[in-house]
Amino acid sequence: VNRIIETLKGIYPDGLCSLQYEKDYELLFAVRLSAQCTDERVNKVTPALYARFPTLESFAEADPKEVGEYIHSCGFYNGKARDIVACARKLVNEYGGKVPGTMEELTGLPGVGRKTANLILGDVFGQPAYVCDTHCIRITGRLGITDGSKDPLQVERQLRERIPPKESNNFCHRMVLFGRDTCTARSPKCDGCPLAKDCGTSKAAAKKK
């Protein structure tokens, strides 16, 4: 596991989230928009959205239908717009306009699950965070870091046992980048993969050739 961590560090030194934001709540909303959508698409949509609604209070007072018009291309825009407005209202009314810093509080916000909460805890608050998105689940299973479970909570529990807390947040960001570049869902680029020597899936594929 340590060799995998160090190899990924060499490929992606920064290990940063690819969603663009300036304010804490903007990251929270961007993650909601990224569900069933690419980060690249979200980054194209959010500048106009945040220009129209420049404060958390303006989101809290917004008509979800108008928010939906700005995020239409992200897909599932009606539900996402409702969640964003409801989340903004709760942040303003119950948290003084601040994004809370605990798993319990974050998952109590509309549209926020453990994946989003972990990302916020890691990127905003600098806490150990295990963001189990589809890339992370797929790749850690292929590498044998986890048992191949597709259940996000099971994967998170296994990663907490095997990935050092101080490495966790950046490791998960690197999993996303590596999943886009090399270890894709279909037709992964096993030939020349820098993690091939530590990957049971790659070794099994090589034997079949």
Range-by-range predicted roles:
Residues V1-K208:
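Catalytic cores of DNA base-excision repair glycosylases
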